């Protein structure tokens, strides 16, 4: 999924993956961190990767604060009573 929040052109999935990998290599104590990350994400400037990181951190804080609801996923494990009800209502012709 491409990200468009912030400014500039959207980030592609390939760019986001390169960005994630670069962050794993160049931690906060790395000299010239954003220049190194930008080199790993072809076509992005140090300013762009730093802004992308700041947006990511902001999003994580927002999620962790509970302001973003968890999606309501259907369970795949199955519930015996629910499954039995489904099978009872199933008519094979």
From Swiss-Prot:
Tissues with expression: Specifically expressed in the dorsal region of developing flowers.
SUPFAM superfamilies in alphabetical order: Homeodomain-like
Null allele phenotype: Radially symmetric flowers. Loss of functional stamens in dorsal positions. Organs reduction with five organs per whorl rather than six.
Chief localisation class: nucleus
Residue ranges annotated for the SANT domain, each copy included: 6-61
Upregulation: Up-regulated by both CYC and DICH.
GO MF term list: DNA-binding transcription factor activity
Matches recorded under Pfam families: Myb_DNA-binding (PF00249)
PROSITE patterns: SANT
InterPro entries listed in its UniProt record: Homeodomain-like_sf, RADIALIS-like, SANT/Myb, SANT_dom
Gene Ontology BP terms: determination of dorsal/ventral asymmetry; flower development
GO cellular component: nucleus
Subcellular location: Nucleus
The entry's keywords: Developmental protein, Nucleus, Transcription, Transcription regulation
Stated role: Involved in the dorsovental asymmetry of flowers. Promotes dorsal identity.
PANTHER family, sorted: MYB FAMILY TRANSCRIPTION FACTOR-RELATED, OS05G0567600 PROTEIN
Protein name: Transcription factor RADIALIS
Source species of the chain: Antirrhinum majus
Gene, per the UniProt record: RAD
């Amino acid at each position: 999924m491409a990200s468009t929040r912030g400014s500039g052109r959207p980030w592609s999935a390939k760019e986001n993956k390169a960005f994630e990998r670069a962050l794993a290599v160049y931690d906060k104590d790395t000299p010239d961190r954003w220049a190194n990350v930008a080199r790993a994400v072809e076509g992005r400037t140090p300013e762009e990767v730093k802004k992308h990181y700041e947006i990511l951190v902001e999003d994580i804080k927002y999620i962790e604060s509970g302001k973003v609801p968890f999606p309501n996923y259907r369970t795949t494990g199955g519930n015996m009573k629910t499954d039995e009800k489904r099978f009872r209502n199933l008519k094979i012709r």
